[in-house]
Amino acid sequence: MATPGRPWAQARSAYRASEVLRRVTGRRRDPGPQSNGPGREDARAPGRLARLLRQLRAEAASRSEVPRLLKLVERAGAGAAGAGERTGAHSRGSVCSVCGEPRGRATYPAGVLEVSERRLQEGLAAVREELGAEIEALRAELRAELDALRALLPPPPPSPPARREPRAVPRAAPRGPTLLRTLGTVSALVAASRPADDAPDGPAECGAHRAPARKNHKKMPVPPGAPQGGGD
């Protein structure tokens, strides 16, 4: 008597095995370069194969004969392992496209970074030269347009003459001390230029020399014994 649910489990196992076989066949038909490292689906494929093999072996253990589906899955697993070994041997001397370090699963051969860098430098040099030529042409065109605009503009008005700033007049020093010093100097010179005979004998005669003596109209008392009159 058949166990209930067994056909559904077999159908599900067959579907999984067919999916695995389809993916393995697709990888064999497309030998082009893959991305660095296995993808998410490819990384899960060996685990799925292992689970499927365990399920099929458990089912085959309950039967006396090994089903044909188990043989197909084992053959597909062996083919996937051989393809992985060939890919590893092919990419053994390759380097990473990002960091340049040797990696087992890299798809770029050794030396490709140097070639890519050289081509990139050549391309950059060509672009730089082309841009420099275009910039020079634009500069010449702008210079010609500016010259034409300057020719159309009216001449500028004459600039006014430069104003001279008034010169600062030095302020006069106070006259009092200077005048006193000048008078003192003149008095000293006059006193030094007089002869020695005309020098006054005392301070009383200084005023008589400077100004004539005024005539005294008052009668002076005559001492006794003195001649009277204004004779010679």
From Swiss-Prot:
Residues 19-31 have a biased composition (Basic and acidic residues). It comes from the Eukaryota. Residues 19-47, 80-101, 151-179, 191-232 are annotated as: Disordered. Transmembrane segments: none annotated. Residues 211-220 have a biased composition (Basic residues). Belongs to the FAM246 family. This is Protein FAM246B. It comes from Homo sapiens (Human).
